[in-house]
Regions:
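Canonical Radical SAM [4Fe-4S] cluster-binding loop centered on the CxxxCxxC motif
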Residues: 1-54
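Short, well-ordered alpha-helix to beta-strand connector turns
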Residues: 16, 31, 122-123, 186, ...
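Core AdoMet radical
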Residues: 18, 38-53, 66-83, 94-112, ...
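Radical SAM enzyme [4Fe-4S]-AdoMet core and its adjacent flexible, acidic
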Residues: 46, 135-150, 154-244, 248, ...
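Aromatic/hydrophobic pocket-lining residues that form the small-molecule binding cavity
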Residues: 52, 56, 86-89, 145-149, ...
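Acidic (Asp/Glu)-rich catalytic clusters
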Residues: 62-65, 116-122, 150-156
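Distinct, well-ordered alpha-helical segments
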Residues: 84-91, 112-120, 172-180
Length: 274
C-alpha cells in the first residue's frame, strides 16, 4: 500500500518573498536553457486558455495567510503574455488578495508593445533580454528578432528591470550591454548565472559591491543598479503555482519537494502495480 508523502512544514508569515503563478504551453521563443524543460512533463500542462488557472484558490488563500506582497506572472516553458486572460486574472487577484501586493510580469518582451495596455496594468516588469546583437540573441533565445527594448522602456508607465542570462555566448558583450541599457533608460538590471553553472565569468570585477540582496552582490554601474544573481547561492524564497495545479514551496523550481514527492509516488506505483 502506498504511503502519502510526508507533508512539508507549513510556511509562516514573513518567510516568503513572493508568489509565482506559472504558465505553460507553446512559446514564442525557444531558449535552449529553459529551466522549465527540466520539470516533469506532467507539470507543464498547457494552461494558456484556462481561467482560472488550476488550484488558484489555494494560491490566493496562502498569499493572504502568509501576507505575501509580491505576485509574479511568469512561465515554466512559455511566456506569461501569451496567457489569454492576462488582464482578467490581474483583476481577480486585485479583488481577492487582501495584502497591498504588487504585481509584476517576467516576460521575454516579445508581446510587450502589442499588449502595452495590459503590460502597463502591472506595477512593474522584468524582461529577459540577453543581448542587443541578433546573432547572440538567437543563440540564447532561439529566434533572431530582438524585441525593441528601448521602445518598451520609453512607452511603459511602470518600472522595467532587465534580466540577462550570462554564458559563453554573451559574456564578452556585457560591459557594452550594460552601457546600452543605461543609455536607453534602464535603471535596474540583473545578470544571472545558469542554475548549476560553476564557471566564474570575468564581469564587474572593477566595480565595487555596494550591497547584497539575498546573498547576491549588488553593484552601481555608472548609476545602473546591477545585481549578479547566483541561483545556487541565493536565499530567496517563493510560493509557486505550477501549471498542473501543484503548489510548490521551493524558490528553485527543479528542487520543489512537492514535485519530488509526487515523482517518488509515481515511481513506486509503477514498480508495484496493484
Amino acid at each position: 500500500m502506498l504511503k502519502p508523502p510526508s507533508p512539508q512544514p507549513p510556511l509562516l508569515p514573513g518567510q516568503v518573498d513572493f508568489a509565482n503563478i506559472l504558465f505553460a504551453g507553446p512559446c514564442n521563443r525557444f531558449c535552449p536553457f529553459c529551466i522549465g524543460q527540466r520539470l516533469p512533463t506532467r507539470v507543464n500542462v498547457n494552461n494558456l486558455d484556462l481561467f482560472p488557472p488550476r488550484n488558484l484558490d489555494a494560491l490566493i488563500d496562502e498569499v493572504n495567510r502568509l501576507g505575501i506582497r509580491h505576485i509574479v506572472f511568469t512561465g515554466t516553458i512559455t511566456d506569461p503574455q501569451l496567457y489569454r486572460h492576462e488582464a482578467r486574472l490581474l483583476d481577480l487577484f486585485r479583488a481577492r488578495v487582501i495584502t497591498s501586493a504588487q504585481y509584476s510580469v517576467h516576460t521575454n518582451g516579445v508581446l510587450a508593445l502589442n499588449k502595452l495596455s495590459v503590460f502597463n496594468r502591472y506595477d512593474k516588469a522584468c524582461i529577459s533580454f540577453p543581448s542587443f546583437n541578433p546573432i547572440t540573441y538567437e543563440k540564447m533565445m532561439g529566434a533572431r528578432r530582438v524585441p525593441d527594448l528601448e521602445a518598451i522602456v520609453a512607452r511603459s508607465n511602470i518600472p522595467v528591470k532587465v534580466s540577462c542570462l550570462v554564458n559563453e555566448h554573451n559574456v564578452a558583450e556585457i560591459d557594452g550591454f550594460l552601457q546600452r541599457c543605461r543609455q536607453i533608460g534602464v535603471t535596474r538590471l540583473v545578470l544571472r548565472k545558469l542554475y548549476g553553472e560553476t564557471r566564474d565569468w570575468p564581469i564587474l570585477r572593477s566595480t565595487p559591491v555596494k550591497a547584497y540582496y539575498r546573498n547576491n552582490p549588488v553593484y552601481d554601474f555608472d548609476g545602473l543598479e546591477v545585481t549578479y544573481w547566483n541561483f545556487d547561492l541565493t536565499t530567496s524564497t517563493s510560493l509557486n503555482l505550477f501549471p498542473d495545479g501543484t503548489l510548490g514551496t521551493s524558490y528553485l523550481l527543479v528542487e520543489t519537494p512537492e514535485l519530488q514527492a509526487q515523482s517518488a509516488l509515481y515511481r513506486t506505483a509503477m514498480q508495484n502495480p496493484a
